[in-house]
Amino acid sequence: IKYFIQKALGKKMFRKPRISVCVPSGVTEVEKKAVEDATYQAGAREVAIIEEPIAAAIGAGIDISRPCGNMIVDIGGGTADIAVISLGGSVVSTSIKIAGDDFDEAIVRYMRKKHNLLIGERTAEDIKIRIGSCFPQAQAETMDVRGRNLVTGLPKTVTVSSEETEEALREPTLQ
């Protein structure tokens, strides 16, 4: 945390900063307190602990103070947080351990199995972001993907469709 404070403020740190830290929904009060203490020790003047779904709702431009429910699904790298937000807080929320990293790994496995193509996590993430889908799309999208042919060891390019990403992501989404 201290590294990021120094990185953001550089040498211009005249006053200790106010810092907001996001935590997954469902963390215990002890875990929140540990994050808060670590942030103070890193040099914060004030610390606000915000649950990730609430931060995601605010970031999406949702007025969280209104008396109507908004369902938020915040898929991070290691966890996915699902919450119903209303009147400035979470009505109900949960955090699951299936998230973006699992989707990337599923795409890597799919490319290896179906195309005999070795790709890295970065390429898998690019596929996920550009054409990834867990549901059938009205119009399929495609993209060219470069990797290493597992049979010849040479570079190889294949065209991958959103239907294939749907197939690749089926296993982690059903968990």
Q: Which residue stretches match the model-derived regions?
A:
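Nucleotide/phosphate-binding catalytic cleft detector across ATP-hydrolyzing
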Residues: 1-75, 83-175
